Amino acid sequence: MHPALSILLPTRGRPDRAEQFLRSVAEMSADPANIEIILYVDKDDPASHAIDCEAIPVIRIIGPSLTMGGLNTACYRRSTGDIIVPLNDDMIIRTPDWDRKIRDVHDRFPDGIYLAYPNDLHAGETFPSTPILSRTTCQRLISPYPEVYAGGFIDYHLMDIFKRLQVLGENRVVYLKDLVIEHMHPQYGKAETDATYRRRGPLDVGDDVFIGLRGYRQKAAQRLASAIKDQPSPDLPDLGKAPLLPDNDFLAVGHFLNVFLADGAIPLHWRAHLFEVLTRRHFLKKYKYPEPAWQYKLLKALAPLLKWPFQFIQKFK
């Protein structure tokens, strides 16, 4: 029997879009009999309680509103598949036999340690908006989707673990350029902003949590390396508390330089990418919303000059 896929699908306030996504799963799958969908809907979202898919079994969880990490964790705990695929209700699968392509990756790694991700037609190879893991990897990580992540950064969290694993001598990241799962997000001009997007805000949260879990991710990478070598795995530390990030611009940039560019446990291109992303988010949060300030307008004008060194560094992988 083929390895079974479990799709984790938290959704809120978008029954039509969720069912559009489910139709794309049914239409594009080579082996729908070996796919299950774990659907999480909030108690106070009755319009979504009846979301279903005739072609593929749907395991429905109706519960309280949770963090994004909590939603994915709840779905993962109910899943039974060999391959775990966290997806969003604002995505559409575009590639026929997409599940076969994922199973082919799964079969390449007898020890089950890998992170695969498709092309979302936006981020490309830069980071995994859909981080696909084996159940074996999830079990080694213990908490693959930490509940402390309220909104974003779970994708960065997992990618960072595997970048650290790469420095430890094991490159287990697989980018599936020809497998397209399109992200239909307003940010990319592919959808209208709805109540669910407005609830999360123009910039997701999680910067502080991501930075605070740096040491945790290093231990997680060491656990995966130990699993590959069939050696005893180190224990994971407590998640701890998210640090308070500097508000002062100079202190913030200095902090990100120290945290990311000076971190020899991750590849140089990934250090540059994280520094650029977190620094940009600092200035966007502070100066773009709710109304663009002069500092934002100045930085926007200087952006091409500021970005090119990091884009250059990121080419060296």
Segments and roles (model prediction):
Residues 4-6, 36, 157:
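Cell-envelope/extracellular polymer assembly enzymes that use nucleotide-activated donors
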Residues 91-130, 167, 171:
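Conserved donor NDP-sugar-binding/catalytic core segment of glycosyltransferases
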